[in-house]
């Protein structure tokens, strides 16, 4: 990974396992929140991750002790994956994708353009 991509928020979308992996660096860039929201704008094709408060009914608790190998926070949701595939019909079932985004640290939000996906190599997708 180049130094430039090491400084960008990143998430992986795994359609085979119906999960989104939010890399630890992304959470760190957001201020290591205890709760996050995952937002999808179908019209603009954007995904957003932002820190939130425990009282937010749309918030997801980040169980930091369960971060996969200390690197990723995982969200498993078949319904979410189906929604993302309706937005991006070119995404293939049983494939994994990586998206690099941009972080506005002062606003506590990371934005990802779904058009900027990179299909992951099969060897990397079989973790």
Feature map (PLM): residue ranges:
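Short, surface-exposed charged micro-motifs
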Residues: 10-12, 35-39, 100
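A broad, low-specificity signal marking well-ordered, structured residues that form hydrophobic/aromatic
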Residues: 11, 20, 36, 47, ...
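Acidic (E/D-rich), amphipathic helical modules within compact regulatory domains
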Residues: 27-46
């Amino acid at each position: 990974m180049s130094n430039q991509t090491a400084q960008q928020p990143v998430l992986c979308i795994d359609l085979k396992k119906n999960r989104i992996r939010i890399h630890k660096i992304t959470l760190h860039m957001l201020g290591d929140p205890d709760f996050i929201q995952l937002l999808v704008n179908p019209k603009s094709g954007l995904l957003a991750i932002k820190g939130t408060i425990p009282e937010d009914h749309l918030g997801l608790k980040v169980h930091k002790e369960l971060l996969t190998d200390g690197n990723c926070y995982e969200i498993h949701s078949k319904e979410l994956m189906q929604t993302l595939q309706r937005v991006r019909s070119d995404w293939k079932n049983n494939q994994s994708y990586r998206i690099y985004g941009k972080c506005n640290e002062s606003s506590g939000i990371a934005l990802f353009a779904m058009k900027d996906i990179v299909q992951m190599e099969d060897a990397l997708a079989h973790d």
